[in-house]
Regions:
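Surface-exposed extracytoplasmic segments
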Residues: 1-164
Length: 164
């Protein structure tokens, strides 16, 4: 059972229930074992970034058969944001992997995700397993492809610092 969802539950359950006017007993997903996490972080997704010989391991997988998207069409949320060319199918500078990982560990993949514009149930778990799986969890530091240059080293010139 992953620790992060349990910690987020302890830290934010009261605030979530108060804000939403709900009585969710546990924010953490209840699907154990977490096949959604295994697919997202260890094996990849069939047809997207899963290799022919599946070896559960933490590595970057890239399906070069999926064409890259121009920065203006990229979703910072990759595959979960209707962009098969994004994370976890490789890793682009504008992929907001922190927000995406937060959403995945809290059960986003238990709910249908848009694939080529069509809501798709991945069959990894059920929506009832993840009561806040569609919540837009964020670290508060938004990221997008527009934040980067289109050529290496991709980082834009820093903003001038404070005068003091």
């Amino acid at each position: 059972n992953p620790t992060l969802p349990a910690l987020l539950d302890v830290l934010f359950r009261d605030a979530v229930n108060s804000t939403l006017g709900t009585h969710i007993a546990n924010l953490a997903p209840a699907n154990i074992p977490r096949q959604d996490l295994v697919a997202a972080f260890l094996t990849g997704f069939p047809g997207v970034n899963q290799l022919k010989t599946v070896t559960a391991s933490e590595m970057s997988r890239l399906n070069t058969g999926i064409p890259a998207k121009p920065a203006s069409q990229q979703s910072a949320f990759g595959v979960a944001g209707n962009d098969l060319a994004g994370f976890p199918n490789g890793r682009r500078p504008g992929d907001d992997v922190v927000d995406l990982a937060l959403r995945v560990v809290m059960g986003r993949l238990c709910h249908p995700i848009p694939v080529n514009g069509t809501p798709t149930d991945l069959g990894l778990c059920k929506p009832a397993d993840a009561p806040v799986g569609t919540a837009p969890f964020t670290d508060g530091a938004p990221l997008s492809a527009a934040d980067f240059d289109s050529r290496f080293p991709y980082l834009k010139t820093p903003n001038p610092g404070a005068t003091n």
